[in-house]
Amino acid sequence: MNYLVNYCKISFYFLMSISLSLFLISLKFLLMDLVYFIEWEILSLQSMSIVMTFLFDWMSLMFMSFVLLISSLVIFYSNQYMEEDYNINRFILLVLMFVMSMMMLIISPNLISILLGWDGLGLVSYCLVIYFQNVKSYNAGMLTALSNRIGDVALLLAIAWMLNYGSWNYIFYLDMMKNNIEMMIIGGLVMLAAMTKSAQIPFSSWLPAAMAAPTPVSALVHSSTLVTAGVYLLIRFNDVLMNWWMAQFLLLVSGLTMFMAGLGANFEFDLKKIIALSTLSQLGLMMSILSMGFYKLAFFHLLTHALFKALLFMCAGSIIHNMKNSQDIRMMGSLSMSMPLTCSCFNVANLALCGMPFLAGFYSKDLILEMVMLSYVNVFSFFL
């Protein structure tokens, strides 16, 4: 067991140190307005070449640092939360595979390498959802996998359409050809892929179902990293969303998702599903502000939301663990007396989610409201 504990701790210290260094580097990139584009050729066949490309700018480095920070804390949390599990070694390896897939997605300006990270996320999340290997987990895992397949097919079709341009490095073509019909089709396909991964209507059923996974997985995968991959992809493709019909369609869908998730959470008794539905409403908020053209604001809310939602899930995991694995909120009472520290952290995260002044959620949500009020589409959104 000591070997496994050390394995967890090594992963924790390694990921945490990389996270802090990447955060400092991203601040330097932001202040100096630096962008590094690294490309090398893997294979060349006559006029066709396969190249591996990485894009390092402040946005990708900062998002990577946040993903690594939450991953390291989740691994540290799993050290004791899952210490009775025989397969904790396999669990940590799956989490590390997930982090690698997420890194691949974040730093790729190339649709093919994005697909590698995208499919890696889908596969590893399926393995993590079915981790407990019972009928409920298998059903939830299949629903998760099949819902995400639609987005994978849309991304493959976008790769096929990119052949019209002669390269898959979409970042070169977004600004120049954003009014072309081909780029509109590619943008529509990317938007469909992002809607499946970020669980917008009509693909939102898989996110509450994926709560069959262990709680550390919910804290990492289904709150802060996997579900925000779709939002991050749309942030990268934000020039294509300047098309008015795409933006209005996305605004309508995300508004409906917010409404549906908020309404559904009122009638739910499962603690983890309530938090999952709040994640869904926050994803709807990110998508709606993205459709109005404020992509940096969507990124800011993505970062703040990741932190307090991971804390919410970890506190929920602690409560469920002490309730002898019962997730029914009707069975919980007087928790503030028996678990004061956990309840304090839970309430802090809850107030941040509500937008309490001077907590993380306040800064992003207040900015979002201010920008929407001052925006020219505010009449449409108010009527919505």
From Swiss-Prot:
UniProt entry keywords in alphabetical sequence: Electron transport, Membrane, Mitochondrion, Mitochondrion inner membrane, NAD, Respiratory chain, Translocase, Transmembrane, Transmembrane helix, Transport, Ubiquinone
Outcome reported for the amino acid change (mutating residue 188 to S): In haplotype 19
Primary location recorded for the protein, binned into one broad class: mitochondrion
Reactions it catalyzes: a ubiquinone + NADH + 5 H(+)(in) = a ubiquinol + NAD(+) + 4 H(+)(out)
Pfam families: Proton_antipo_M, Proton_antipo_N
Superkingdom field: Eukaryota
Mode of membrane association: Multi-pass membrane protein
GO biological process entries: ATP synthesis coupled electron transport; electron transport coupled proton transport
Protein name: NADH-ubiquinone oxidoreductase chain 5
Keyword Ubl conjugation set for record: no
GO cellular component terms given for this protein: mitochondrial inner membrane
Effect upon mutating residue 239 to N: In haplotype 10
Function: Core subunit of the mitochondrial membrane respiratory chain NADH dehydrogenase (Complex I) that is believed to belong to the minimal assembly required for catalysis. Complex I functions in the transfer of electrons from NADH to the respiratory chain. The immediate electron acceptor for the enzyme is believed to be ubiquinone.
MF terms in GO: NADH dehydrogenase (ubiquinone) activity
Gene coding for it: ND5
Cellular localisation: Mitochondrion inner membrane
Membrane-spanning segments: 12-32, 50-70, 92-112, 113-133, 153-173, 183-203, 215-235, 244-264, 274-293, 298-320, 343-363, 364-384
Family from the record: Belongs to the complex I subunit 5 family.
Coiled-coil residue windows: none
UniProt-listed Enzyme Commission number(s): 7.1.1.2
